[in-house]
From Swiss-Prot:
A lipid is attached at residue 2 (N-myristoyl glycine). A lipid is attached at residue 3 (S-palmitoyl cysteine). Coiled coil: none annotated. Residues 323-328 are annotated as: G5 motif. Guanine nucleotide-binding proteins (G proteins) are involved as modulators or transducers in various transmembrane signaling systems. Involved in the mating pathway. Residues 265-272 are annotated as: G4 motif. Pfam families: G-alpha. Residues 173-181 are annotated as: G2 motif. Mg(2+) binds at residues 47, 181. SUPFAM superfamilies: P-loop containing nucleoside triphosphate hydrolases, Transducin (alpha subunit), insertion domain. It comes from Cochliobolus heterostrophus (strain C4 / ATCC 48331 / race T) (Southern corn leaf blight fungus). CDD domains: G-alpha. This is Guanine nucleotide-binding protein subunit alpha.
Length: 353
């Protein structure tokens, strides 16, 4: 009887080799694949960061893609004016020029979703006239008292361009457009030798229970906080301060048993709006232990320390950046720094350093 391997044994050996080779390939792929989880409360800027990644690493948006944002931008603009006009009623603020009442009715007659290739001329004209009204401006200055999109002023100031029949959205128009994220979206980018898989999850409270258990093996968490919202209340619960909510959420993520070995990068975002607000809306009104007055650097230090001090793990480092997610040049620089951090973390996780 010969001592050669049976056909069955040969097939078994071949299968084992195939499995081992696949495992080696998977490990190599894993080393070059970065899973990044984007977290933060609603409207903190997560989707804007994803748009920036497309602009920076994929050469931006094609004409067709820009065209596809038009209806979102029209709807955002009209809806923002509607929100201000409704707030004027509840705050009992009259129009400065009562002749503009005709334009108020034009806005209220528009559907929630504006459809079509161009904004109707009467709607563009109504927004242009109303935005110049002193009563509307007074209500806008009190926007922390109601729920208004960050992009409102930008779109109102650009209304003549947006309402033009041949309008094509530019990069800033696209970056500032707002669609509520529900569920989990995955976006893939190639940066150098690395493949980034970025997961964006809905920031509103109702979405959060879907988060944690799905993402135990992510490389990095990018956590965004809109620091300009220190004086605002939650969209979902107008008894809760937005910054307090962000602190609570960061505490739960930073100290979660699921993310003990996961590096966390903290973007303290919307610094442009934060700087504008500090002189007119004292932070001490909302955080009584803050003593820095309207000083921008002192306010930044205070907020940074409030977040970083929540970390209960001595060995876990929180990497922090102050950001303006709509500023492409700044985000390009910050994301390059983030990329360096992630490469180091990835090498460490793979046991190569």
């Amino acid at each position: 009887m010969g001592c050669g391997m049976s056909t069955e044994e040969k097939e078994g050996k071949q299968r084992n080799e195939e499995i081992e080779n696949q495992l080696k390939r998977d490990k190599l792929m894993q080393r070059n694949e970065i899973k990044m989880l984007l977290l933060g409360a609603g409207e903190s800027g997560k989707s804007t960061i994803l748009k920036q990644m497309k602009l920076i690493h994929e050469g931006g948006y094609s004409r067709d893609e820009r065209e596809s944002f038009k209806e979102i931008i029209f709807s955002n603009t009209v809806q923002s004016m509607r929100v201000i006009l409704e707030a004027m009623e509840s705050l009992e603020l009259p129009l400065d020029d009562q002749r503009a009442e005709y334009h108020v009715q034009t806005i209220f007659m528009q559907p929630a979703q504006i459809e079509g290739d161009s904004l109707p001329p009467e709607v563009g004209n109504a927004i242009s006239v109303l935005w110049k009204d002193a009563g509307v401006q007074q209500c806008f200055q009190r926007s922390r008292e109601y729920q208004l999109n960050d992009s409102a002023k930008y779109y109102f100031d650009s209304i003549d361009r947006i309402a033009a029949p041949d309008y094509i959205p530019n990069d800033q128009d696209v970056l500032r457009s707002r669609v509520k994220t529900t569920g989990i979206t995955e976006t893939t980018f190639i940066i150098g030798d690395l493949t980034y898989r970025m997961f964006d999850v809905g920031g509103q409270r109702s979405e959060r229970k879907k988060w944690i258990h799905c993402f135990e093996n992510v490389t990095t968490i990018l956590f965004l906080v809109a620091i300009s919202e220190y004086d605002q209340l939650l969209f979902e619960d107008e008894t809760v301060n937005r910054m307090q909510e962000a602190l609570t959420l960061f505490d739960s993520i930073c100290n979660s048993r699921w993310f003990v070995k996961t590096s966390i990068i903290l973007f303290l975002n919307k610094i442009d709006r934060f700087k504008e607000k500090l002189p007119v809306s004292p932070m001490k009104n909302y955080f009584p232990d803050y003593e820095g007055g309207p000083d921008y650097a002192a306010a930044c230090d205070y907020i940074l320390n409030r977040f970083v001090s929540l970390n209960q793990h001595e060995t876990k480092q929180i990497y922090t950046h102050f950001t303006c997610a709509t500023d492409t040049m700044q985000i390009r620089f910050v994301m390059a720094a983030v990329n360096d951090i992630i490469i180091q973390e990835n090498l460490r996780l793979c046991g190569l350093i």
